[in-house]
Amino acid sequence: FDDEYEYRDYWVLLNDEDLMRFSKWLVKTTIDNYQSYRMLIEKYLKKGWTIDRISKMEQAILLIAVCEILESDLDEKIVINEAVINAKEFCDEDSYKFINGVLHKIV
């Protein structure tokens, strides 16, 4: 953590019951629909590509975003923005462009 405030904010979020409930729902729903989400994502990849060709982190970000888009009432623009932020933080340099493109095709 960069500073003391960021550390405190993290613990506040961890103790937020609504956030924990949503997080558990998100993980369970993503797992329950794993195969159908993979097929949907694959449909929008470059011709000849499979989802196994992209990194595990990119897969995870896409799967969770697809779950949020299809199964929740969250605004699609917000979901895509969060996915792009996560890709910038946890993936290769240009992965966020790829994630953004795939999710925009899905919505």
Describe the predicted segments one by one.
Residues F1-Y96, N100-V107:
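N-terminal interaction/assembly modules
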